[in-house]
Regions:
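Active-site acidic/histidine proton-transfer and metal-coordination neighborhood
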Residues: 2-12, 81, 85-86, 97-207, ...
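Generic structural signal for well-ordered alpha-helices
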Residues: 4-6, 44-51, 72-79, 118-122, ...
Length: 344
């Protein structure tokens, strides 16, 4: 088969569905600019901005809906006006009242509040027809040696998620792991630990949300992490961004780790994974609409590059562990697609 024939076959594959976290269009603060980088926005404002992107189809929504007095009906109407759909809900059980943990809080009353908040978000998710409830237990972990009983933290986390999964068997729960921040060490800190926890839960409707940036600065190879989750049929969702591997910078896709991001999407495609390609970018100082368009343009180039990739040649190079040959094959496809994308 000629290379061009292979390209034509690959290019006929349907384009992915593109999504974003609604927080991509929010106003951000940090510990220095506590007054924020711009005017405050409600979730309705953010949804309207998302509609301006033009290539987004779905959104992941924080819940309770910021700033907290907005109804599900209002959000559903705002989504419909922008021709968008709710992909997921992300319950905010990582705020100040959960400073010592959500699922792992030493106070059983606060632990119950966290579980109940996630359950309430799942009910909202049902109303909106989401694909999954995203679980990001940002406050579940520890900060100092000797602070916590690690077995206790693990058990409380597993038990809470098992309870939720069994209470909502019709919904999927996607656990977004992260090595640290806001806690110095988090319970679900890697793909391996998260998969092991899911195994301990013994339920079918809990899986992994693989955030590319979390995987990077957690010392993983994101493509390898994706393969591990897919092999166990547990990769429920992805978030895509970039960073300098030292922190969760949430930069625009492909800004730093261009080749590794392409390898990540190749791993997904090669394994037949067909989920949403979702942005999780934090454009603190950039225009959020343009940042989303830039991220999608880059992801579209990655998708095009998958069609240009000579897979037989790549497989032969990988079988021989020919590092330079494999990189040359990947770069040839990627740089062609990027050049076409940036000149369009």
């Amino acid at each position: 088969m000629l290379n061009q024939d292979r390209i034509d076959i690959q290019e006929s594959v349907a384009e992915p569905v593109y999504g974003a976290g609604v927080w991509h269009f929010a106003t951000y603060v940090d510990r220095y600019a506590t007054d924020g980088y711009g005017e405050p926005r409600t979730i309705l404002d953010a949804i309207k901005l998302a509609g301006e992107v033009g290539d987004l189809s779905v959104l992941d929504l924080n819940w309770p809906f910021p700033p907290g007095d907005i109804t599900t009906a209002e959000v559903r109407r705002a989504l419909a006006e922008q021709n968008l759909r709710a992909l997921a809900v992300t319950p905010e059980f990582y705020t100040g009242r959960f400073a010592k943990g959500g699922f792992t809080n030493p106070d059983p009353a606060v632990r119950r509040q966290a579980i109940d908040l996630v359950a309430a978000s799942a009910e909202v998710g049902r109303e909106l027809g989401v694909d999954y409830v995203k679980i990001w237990p940002g406050q579940d972990g520890y900060d100092y040696p000797f602070q916590a009983d690690y077995t206790d933290l693990w058990g409380k986390s597993v038990d809470a998620l098992r309870e939720l999964a069994q209470s909502f068997p019709d919904l999927k729960f996607a656990v977004e792991y992260k090595p640290r921040e806001p806690r110095n060490r988090m319970v679900f800190s890697s793909v391996a630990r998260t998969l092991l926890a899911i195994e301990d839960m013994g339920v079918d409707n809990v899986g992994v949300l693989l955030d590319f940036g979390h995987s990077l600065y957690g010392g993983e190879t994101p493509a390898e992490a994706a393969r591990m989750a897919i092999a166990r049929d547990k990769l429920f969702a992805i978030d895509v961004n970039d960073n300098f591997r030292g922190w969760d910078d949430d930069m625009v896709v492909g800004s730093v780790h261009l080749l590794e991001t392409f390898e990540f999407f190749f791993a997904l495609d090669d394994a037949g994974w067909q989920g949403v390609w979702q942005l999780d970018q934090f454009p603190f100082r950039e225009d959020p609409v343009e940042a989303a368009r830039t991220g999608i343009r880059t992801m579209r180039a990655f998708h095009q590059a998958l069609g240009y990739l000579d897979r037989d040649e790549l497989a032969a190079a990988q079988a021989a562990q020919d590092a330079l040959g494999a990189q040359r094959i990947a770069k040839r496809a990627l740089f062609r697609a990027l050049a076409e994308s940036e000149s369009a």
